[in-house]
Amino acid sequence: LQQNLLKDREKAEQSLREYHAFYLRELVNAATGLVCNCSGKDNSYFRLYNYPWAVTFFLECWKLWGEKENLKTAVRITEKFYEQDGFRFYPIEMPIVMLCQELEKAGEQEDLKTVRDLFRRHADQLIEIGTAYPASEVNYEQSIVQPAAEVILQVYEVTGEEKYLRGAEQQIAVLELFDGQQPDYHLHETAIRHWDGYWFGKRRVFGDTFPHYWSAENGRTFKRYARLTGNEEYNIRGEHSLRGVLSMFFEDGTATCAYLYPYSVNGQKADFADPYANDQDWGLCMNLE
């Protein structure tokens, strides 16, 4: 979508149209909002993480082309997410504010009320859970805490209700614990993550990754908090967090999905950028917001 701002717009838009068609044909049931994990609408491996990304995609298509069906699809996907116990889930990149803003602009008041109520219920549930985080795909990690902070903080932005700001601040206090301020670009405001070189890398090595693209999620939350409260310290910290993942891109145009920071892991040499370029463009997306 960002490529549409460049000079070769026609070629980029054709590619985007083709991907939009692929998404609807292979992954998303636009009528029901179901988002499948694999092509062929194969949902044998159920994954709620896919839903927020699908909402974001169709929202961006709506913003670009002005085709109302994309906005409606984003709403149906949101509703389907919550039908499947999404209220207790910790989603990465749920575009709460953007969806509400776009529905408001489009005059879709009924849909706006529906999704606002869903988002409030979600935030209320996460506040009730507090710091007694349930296990997700792993038992505990930064990308469980950050979604809690981000969902609650976005609901505060949409509603202006003080209880959501207080709830988000409880989560941010925990989120900060994943970051250090060491004088090394690998470690300065870069949230610690552990499994990503194994799950997403070529060499499949467990070990602390500094950085991995999801590290920058902290930066998004810190900057949102700064904007809503006027706390400049968090704006600076957020900027450092976002810049930290830019080290995953190299001057020759190649990139890495994760940097395995320890010198060795279980006796195996580490301290390397994994050869795979795999999803690291999320880091660019977060810097472009």
Put a short name on every predicted segment.
Residues 1-10, 53-67, 83, 93-112, ...:
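Well-ordered alpha-helical scaffold segments within catalytic/enzyme domains
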Residues 1-63, 72-75, 79:
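Substrate-binding groove/exosite segments of carbohydrate-active enzymes
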Residues 8-26, 65-84, 107-130, 160-178, ...:
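Extended, well-ordered alpha-helical scaffold segments
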Residues 23-43, 70, 76-94, 120-145, ...:
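Glycine- and aromatic-rich loop/turn segments at beta-sheet edges
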Residues 40-49, 54, 60-62, 68-75, ...:
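C-terminal low-complexity, acidic/polar tails when present
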Residues 47-50, 144, 211:
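Hydrophobic alpha-helical segments of membrane proteins, primarily the transmembrane helices
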Residues 121, 125, 148-289:
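Terminal, non-catalytic domain-edge segments
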